[in-house]
Amino acid sequence: MRTMSLNIGTIHFVGIGGIGMSGIAEILHNLGYSVQGTDIADNYNVERLRKMGIRVHIGHAAEALGDARVVVVSSAVKADNPEVQAARAKLVPVVRRAEMLAELMRLKSAIAIGGTHGKTTTTSLIAALLDTARLDPTVINGGIINAYGTNARLGASEWMVVEADESDGSFIKLPSTAVVVTNIDPEHMDHYGTVERLHEAFRTFVENIPFYGFAAMCIDHPEVQALVARVPDRKLVTYGFNHQALVRVEKLSMDITGARYDVVITDRVTGATRTIADIHLPMYGEHNVLNSLAAIAVANELGLPNDVVKTALGGFKGVKRRFTRTGEAKGVTVIDDYGHHPVEIAAVLKAARSACQGNVIAVVQPHRYSRLSSLFAEFCTCFNDADMVIVADVYAAGEKPMEGFDKAALVKGLQEHGHRRVMALADSKALAPLVNSLAGPGDMVVCLGAGNITSWAHALPADLAALPDPSPGGAE
């Protein structure tokens, strides 16, 4: 069954190198559709798509549209984009990314993972469980799954696992058989305007599942627990550390290899319980344990056996830019993480604290002036588990600077909120010398942000190794 004819013509993606756009483009290409696209610069995703035979033009221009018969855009693409303008002049339909994703989902029984944080890892964990059960799912994720080397794969079964992006509200249009809600925090307020509208969008996301579907919901988060009470006529499976959760953790311990725990599953109708004992998850942090509980809740609803759950989680290879170890130099471990919201930063640093024997040094590149502005108080209090904080310039992501919300303001704000060791980073070239003066064997440097700080994290081990050891009692 197809919803779109293969003869629809060329599908053109504006911003094809984006993590969400590239996944959809890859799946469409693998299904046999003619796909092309543009982006402002080469990146990993662009090169990957080119190797598959997809044409990608660097730079945005009306001529790049060619003979495309439909144009796909993300929320980041503005109406004045020359390709969008050319498409509309030619009466070529321009559709949002979520609309094209919805077309793919109509072919499958889809599980959509939503929430402010944890979507990408949870999507990857659910995909791993279905893979291990030999259910061969189609997957479209918001991050590179290390086991695949890509953020998308085309499977042969009826199942599909997708990350649902709530940033522009279009996730409510996704036709899902089941959904996951990991948490709900104030984010993307430039779109929603009010917290109430954000909450209402998540309510719609859950209520849109069919009567035979289900929603896995983390009731450790107060807004998700409140949402549970507002959705009476759908099957809801709660999970968390909360003792009232239907899927909950017991006997949690963590060491250098990750987390070990039991999971108790309660039947919401009969009250009967069963336990999956001695699960090993090779990831750090309670937030990742919660992500695994979401996957276990889904697995339980699909009837997957305990040994599949334990094998899949125990062999999980992680997601690119989610607590990714980029290397070690002079006994200092360097971590790259996508965390850019205060809740994510706090969770990552808590995980680093549990995994590190020495000092935790956070290097943060704030992402967008608007986010730093709207969550400034939270940014000033989310670094408590870091012994030292290095603050880089804001990664603008196309935004104009906002007075009073920049690198200097965050340094000052952290100091005023009681953080004892905070310093500004002059530029990326200054990072290795600064870390060299601060870090010692057993320490961990955690690079945080959604911008180009990932390249700094990957370069840092070699840059650090090339520097002479600092003199005793070196710079503070």
Curated annotation (Swiss-Prot):
Family label: Belongs to the MurCDEF family.
Keyword terms, alphabetized: ATP-binding, Cell cycle, Cell division, Cell shape, Cell wall biogenesis/degradation, Cytoplasm, Ligase, Nucleotide-binding, Peptidoglycan synthesis
Chemical reaction(s) catalysed: UDP-N-acetyl-alpha-D-muramate + L-alanine + ATP = UDP-N-acetyl-alpha-D-muramoyl-L-alanine + ADP + phosphate + H(+)
HAMAP family: MurC
Listed GO CC annotations: cytoplasm
Superkingdom of the organism of origin: Bacteria
Name assigned to this protein: UDP-N-acetylmuramate--L-alanine ligase
GO biological process per UniProt: cell division; cell wall organization; peptidoglycan biosynthetic process; regulation of cell shape
Protein encoded by which gene: murC
